[in-house]
Swiss-Prot record:
InterPro entries: PRibTrfase_dom (IPR000836), PRTase-like (IPR029057), PyrR (IPR023050), PyrR_bifunctional (IPR050137). Keywords: Glycosyltransferase, Transcription, Transcription regulation, Transferase. It catalyses: UMP + diphosphate = 5-phospho-alpha-D-ribose 1-diphosphate + uracil. It comes from the Bacteria. Substrate binds at residues 44-45, 85, 105-113, 138, 162. Regulates the transcription of the pyrimidine nucleotide (pyr) operon in response to exogenous pyrimidines. Also displays a weak uracil phosphoribosyltransferase activity which is not physiologically significant. The keyword Nuclease does not apply. The lineage of its organism: Bacteria, Bacillati, Cyanobacteriota, Cyanophyceae, Nostocales. This is Bifunctional protein PyrR. It comes from Nostoc sp. (strain PCC 7120 / SAG 25.82 / UTEX 2576). GO terms for molecular function: uracil phosphoribosyltransferase activity. Its EC number is 2.4.2.9. It holds the Pfam family Pribosyltran.
Length: 180
């Protein structure tokens, strides 16, 4: 990849904290029974985001919600373009039948990752409802998928990249827009 021409901070650590609090509040408001809520983070950055949202929901409501990690490697429709990758480990320890599942991802772009995640979820039961929470929605969909919960709407050029940094994974919290 070429050297970035510009890097713009979109969310600072404090902005990210506020955004996660707002997302958690919205999820709580739209969930009829929090005891049936399961947050499924999509590898890679969706996993720690799901954990952060679960902690925030516990802070807000005093309830532990289910959290899992979803690897979509074998459900992707672009394996011929990106090549086979070593799959991460899906970690879903409960039957999703009848649950309110919120898929969590860092950035939604074309929508293809979420399409693959929807296919993968069916391997673990039939949820009552599946919703989608994303930290950043940058537009440019290629499939008709729309998130239910959005931290930040960020119109971008197709060649720009949104980078999400999380303390537990990267040593800092931030969201940046990188232009080339």
């Amino acid at each position: 990849m070429a050297t970035p021409a510009k890097v713009i901070e979109i969310l600072s650590a404090e902005d990210l904290r506020r955004t996660l609090t707002r997302l958690a509040s919205q999820i709580v408001e739209r969930t009829r029974d929090l005891s049936q809520l399961v947050l499924l983070g999509i590898y890679t950055r969706g996993v720690p985001l799901a954990e952060l949202l679960a902690r925030q929901i516990e802070t807000l409501e005093g309830i532990n919600v289910g959290v899992g990690a979803l690897d979509i490697t074998f459900y992707r429709d672009d394996l011929d373009q990106i090549g086979l990758r070593t799959p991460a480990k899906t970690s879903i320890t409960l039957d999703l039948t009848g649950k309110t599942v919120v898929l969590v991802d860092d950035v939604i772009f074309k929508g293809r990752t979420i399409r693959a995640a929807l296919n993968a979820v069916n391997e673990y039961g039939r949820p009552e409802v599946i919703r989608l929470a994303v930290l950043v929605d940058r537009g440019h969909r290629e499939v008709p998928i729309h998130p239910d919960f959005v931290g930040k709407q960020l119109p971008t050029a197709k060649e720009e990249v949104v980078k999400v940094y999380l303390q537990d994974w990267d040593g800092r919290d931030a969201v940046e827009l990188v232009g080339y």
